[in-house]
């Protein structure tokens, strides 16, 4: 995004110091001067800045504190700002996922990675198949208006 939009500035955060270091190295290799990365818990974003646009990809369900993460994102968005949250398209109800094209994979990955990561930190353990219904509830409770949901 930094190279595609040189007149914009980008900040990335990750819980993992290693991931942040890799991102910083990649940005330096690409000679990007409009990007920066910080090690932070997304449930407690520490910045005085407000953002026009925030993105998360396949991330909310892995968090130890997903509700706090979503609330933290809402807090740092400018009024009228947008959050693009891309996640696996599923239902929050197991029975509605029986014919899901990658349902078995989603539940397996959840047990072996997503939930394990979250639960290791005393988290909620949503998993990849947390579903649209639960996402809507979490997002609206944080204050988001859901103007577009593509499922």
Please report, for each region that a protein language model flagged, where it lies by residue.
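A short acidic, Gly/Pro-enriched loop at the edge of an enzyme's catalytic core
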Residues: 43-54
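Conserved SAM/SAH-binding beta-strand->alpha-helix loop
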Residues: 16-18
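Conserved SAM-binding motif I beta-strand of class I
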Residues: 9-14
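A short glycine-rich, Lys/Arg-flanked "PGG" loop and its adjoining helix->strand segment in the class I
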Residues: 67-79
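Conserved small/polar residues in nucleotide/adenosyl-binding loops
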Residues: 149-151
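A short SAM/SAH-binding and catalytic strip from SAM-dependent methyltransferases
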Residues: 52-66
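Conserved SAM-binding strand-loop segment of SAM-dependent methyltransferases
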Residues: 30-42
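C-terminal alpha-helical "lid/dimerization" subdomain adjacent to the S-adenosyl-L-methionine
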Residues: 86-141
């Amino acid at each position: 995004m930094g190279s595609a939009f040189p007149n914009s500035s980008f900040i990335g955060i990750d819980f993992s110091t290693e991931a942040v270091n890799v991102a910083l190295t990649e940005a330096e290799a690409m000679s990007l001067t409009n990007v920066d990365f910080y090690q932070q818990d997304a449930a407690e974003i520490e910045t005085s800045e407000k953002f026009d646009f925030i993105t998360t990809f396949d991330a909310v369900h892995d968090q130890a504190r997903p509700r706090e993460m979503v609330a933290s994102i809402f807090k740092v968005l400018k009024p009228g700002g947008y959050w693009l949250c891309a996640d696996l398209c599923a239902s929050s109800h197991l029975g509605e996922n029986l014919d899901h094209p990658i349902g078995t994979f989603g539940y397996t990955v959840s047990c072996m990675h997503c939930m394990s990561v979250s639960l290791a930190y005393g988290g909620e353990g949503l998993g990849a198949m947390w579903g649209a219904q639960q996402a809507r509830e979490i997002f609206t409770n944080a204050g988001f208006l859901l103007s577009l949901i593509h499922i």
